[in-house]
Swiss-Prot record:
Family: Belongs to the DadA oxidoreductase family.
Catalytic activity: a D-alpha-amino acid + A + H2O = a 2-oxocarboxylate + AH2 + NH4(+)
HAMAP family reported in the protein's UniProt record: DadA
Swiss-Prot/TrEMBL keywords: FAD, Flavoprotein, Oxidoreductase
Residue numbers binding FAD: 3-17
Species whose genome carries this gene: Azotobacter vinelandii (strain DJ / ATCC BAA-1303)
Gene Ontology BP terms: D-alanine catabolic process
Name of the featured protein: D-amino acid dehydrogenase
GO molecular function, one term: D-amino-acid dehydrogenase activity
Name of the coding gene: dadA
Entry's transmembrane regions: none
InterPro entries in the cross-refs: DadA, FAD-dep_OxRdtase, FAD/NAD-bd_sf
């Protein structure tokens, strides 16, 4: 069976790899000139299943109002003329109840934990090198109020069987020695020892090479225009004016996925959540992070690669604007300068932005559609790197009619309604 995968970010590439392993003939199409050149290019670098949480949470509406007036707020809303922005916000607000938060977080943690296990297996099988570290993630709380509020997340971790450790100031200095000088300004920390780090762009590039070795064909520099349908089937993809056909199709185009789905009558509530990062050369390894640090106040992650520090975070609802906001750079520099003032050379930092494809409930969309041969793997928000391997393998199993290793409940697009356009009465074809 021939599969056309649209998108060569970390999601599309992992999907292609697992499909090829399952015996499918796979072609990947992307407008970029290489894998992982957009959202996957310079993300925060963390593989953090335990911190898989939706932005839609109790208390967020009030916090968002307060953040409107803060210079270094983690969330910013830039009103546009796009009605989809306001619809997405309304849907997000409906998910800010305690019950919805717990349900959404369970789905996200389930997929993220599985994805971490898939990454471990992939690394053991292939020896893929992406500057990965398996040294955990530490979430820093600057106030006692933040530490107390973490109780609801800790409860979910406990129910999900995720190991964790609460750290006092001495414990923070033990796991992250470079923070010893600032530990007295922190209230405490939550450490997840099983979390990991790694360069997502490097991983995707090298996985694409492994996929090519399995027969996957990558076609770069080609723009996907629209999907063509006939009844309940997709009959082809219009690419640079020509029609490309396959037996099965996978849409993994991140924030751009809804544009292709809307003409098919599929409403995918995905909106771009703009994020920023700095990549900083390390000048003193002893004063740099050991693994990943999450600053709860600013919602910023600081991650250690071999010779670089990656500082990433922020969330802007600003449509598809890819301009670099200097105020966001100030925030990233503020956080890393406060916690690791001697670790890297900020004067040589590279500033970047990308559009994360966010759903209003935080859970990605992985699975079938009402079209018998169209599948989705998109909407991973800030957790594309964390969820990539698990999402790719899960979808490949579903398409091959192989029993998945985890439950796929609540992950496909049918959770957004029972209308005809979102029903999932599909019959995926098996691999030869």
């Amino acid at each position: 069976m021939r599969v056309l995968v649209l998108g060569s970010g970390v999601i599309g590439t992992t999907t292609a790899y697992y499909l090829a392993r399952a015996g499918f003939e796979v072609v990947v199409v992307d407008r970029a000139e290489a894998p992982a050149m957009e959202t996957s290019f310079a993300n925060a670098g963390q593989v953090s299943p335990g911190y898989a949480s939706p932005w839609a949470a109790p208390g967020v509406p009030l916090k968002a109002l307060k953040w409107l007036f803060e210079r270094h707020a983690p969330l910013a809303i830039r009103p546009t003329a796009d009605w989809r922005q306001y619809l997405w916000l309304a849907q997000m607000l409906r998910n800010c109840t305690a019950g919805r938060y717990a349900l959404n977080k369970e789905r996200m943690v389930r997929l993220s934990e599985y994805s971490r296990d898939c990454l471990d297996e992939l690394r053991a099988e292939t020896g893929i090198d992406y500057e990965g570290r398996q040294l955990g993630t530490t979430q820093l709380f600057r106030t006692q109020r933040q530490l107390d509020a973490a109780g609801k997340d800790i409860a979910v971790l406990a129910r999900s069987g995720v190991p964790y450790e609460l750290l006092d100031r001495a414990g923070i200095a033990r796991v992250e020695p470079a923070l010893a000088g600032v530990a007295d300004r922190l209230a405490g920390a939550l450490r997840l020892p099983n979390d990991q780090t790694g360069d997502c762009h490097l991983f995707t590039t090298r996985l694409a090479e492994l996929a090519a070795g399995l027969g996957v064909e990558f076609r770069f520099g080609q723009s996907v225009e629209r999907l063509e349908r006939d009844g309940e089937r997709i009959v082809g993809v219009r690419i640079d004016g020509r029609l490309e056909s396959a037996d099965l199709y996978v849409l993994a185009l991140g924030s751009y996925s809804p544009r292709l789905l809307a003409p098919l009558g599929i409403r995918a509530p995905i909106y771009p959540l703009k994020g920023y990062s700095l990549t900083i050369p390390i000048v003193d390894p002893a004063m740099a992070p050991t693994s990943t640090i999450l600053d709860e106040t600013y919602k910023v992650a600081i991650t250690r690669f071999e010779t670089r520090i990656r500082v990433g975070g922020m969330a802007e609802l600003a449509g598809f604007d890819l301009s670099l906001n200097p105020r966001r750079r100030e925030t990233l520099e503020l956080v890393v300068g406060d916690l690791y003032p001697r670790g890297g050379d900020l004067a040589r930092a590279e500033f970047w932005t990308g559009l994360r494809p966010a759903t209003p409930d935080g859970t990605p969309i992985v699975g079938a559609t009402r079209y018998r041969n169209l599948f989705l793997n998109t909407g991973h928000g800030t957790l594309g790197w964390t969820m990539a391997c698990g999402s790719g393998r899960l979808l490949a199993d579903l398409m091959a009619r192989t029993r998945p290793q985890i439950s796929a409940a609540g992950l496909d697009i049918s959770r957004y309604g029972n209308s005809q356009e979102n029903s999932t009465h599909v019959h995926p074809a098996p691999a030869n």
